[in-house]
Amino acid sequence: MSTFKITNNPNSIIIDDHLKLGGPDASNTIDVNGVYMTHHLSSISGKDVVQPFKHNNKYYILIGEIYNCDNTLGSDIYFCIEKYLEHGDKFTEYLDGEFLFIIYDEKTNTIDLFTDPWSTRQAFYYKIDNYFYFSTYPMTEPKDGRFGPGGLTQSFELKFAVYNDTEWNNTFYRIPHNSHHNYNVKTGILKPVNTELHKWNLNQYKDNLDDLTNSFEEAVLKRHTENSTLFLSSGLDSSPIAMCLADHKKHFNSMTCLTGPWEGREDMETLNQVLQYTGTYNKNIKIENLPPDYDIFWDEKKSKSKWSNNRNRLVFANLAHILTGFMREKCISEFNSKVIFTGNGGDEIFDNYPSLPAGYPLKFNGNTNKNPSGFSIWPEDLSTVFPWQHFYGGQARRLLDLFETLSLAYGLENRNAFYDKKFAQEWLHVMPWIKNQTPKVLQKKYLRDRGIKVPS
């Protein structure tokens, strides 16, 4: 996934060691007239370009993956530069991926930052004294942390608190979703250029799930890479990903957690059916017990983890448990994997977090209690609710940033099939009478079409 830092401060700072964890394979820093640009590489394909990459008077950094890249160009960043030179600031419409793209123009002394529709790759701006910083991680955190407490057993008020792209004070800012921001190094002014790079079509006219299903499979397959690891549960988001990969004869690893906060939460009948269905292509391991010397609650002074304190501080200081860190350790030790496949986004984009049991339609009792501030019925006029609470902000922002922070601590890359521009657009196009049949209508149909029990 890689990490970056751009600053006018020539000295090392506290987050440098954190950034190196996210890009363990190579590091490069260049000085461009007092602007220091650093890129830490996590190599996935082995076909990597030293970044920042200079073309004419501009320096480019790409964080993330471009899935529609022209492979003859040799690297994703070349493709991005080509599209930028062809289309200017509208070039992101020609990119399909999970990315952050940065351009420093030494002639105008400006920095431009472009995010994908959900800003799946973090970028923070902050200013301390006379120094400015752009980086993957913030220099400081809000008092109570960015991620809140561990969510599985928390109340609605805590678990589904609204986490927005937000400016916490006058010197600290997270570069938001779907946007182009420009920073003038001389004046110190950061300004939005475009806060809606990608415009969604809210016309609900498709009376079947065919195009949506095809776009789901495309989203999964273009994110598949050799030796990737799926975090697999019996849930409605990761299970269809596993079956799609198996249907297309794609080999993958998977990991299922049955201990800690997940103990007793899986529908084992559904999980076993999915494992049987995907068995030829799926190398699965189950985490049923933690090693006796593994501390599930992190204490820096008492920590028995083999990982450095820098990693512990980065990942676990604001979390109630560290089991998700253990799962990432296993990705490396069991599979030597560098890419994590997740079902993240299935709730945020396709369900708006209703609380109804899987067997009930959205109209059951006319409301929900899991997200009382949200809507329970998809309306005829989608513009009345779009973008809904968790489409960009809320849990979408919280979980994207949380999972990226967790994975970068181990030099791993997340790939999120549900945060796909075409796939999300196809969902928006589906007529409301289909959306309102049942929560996660696509995922349930995908399981039932393959003879898999829908989890209760």
Which stretches of residues belong to each language-model region?
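Cysteine-centered catalytic environments shared across enzyme families
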Residues: 1-292, 299, 338
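ATP-dependent adenylate-handling active sites, centered on carboxylate activation for C-N bond formation
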Residues: 6-13, 108-112, 120, 128-129, ...
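Conserved PLP cofactor-binding pocket of PLP-dependent enzymes
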Residues: 456
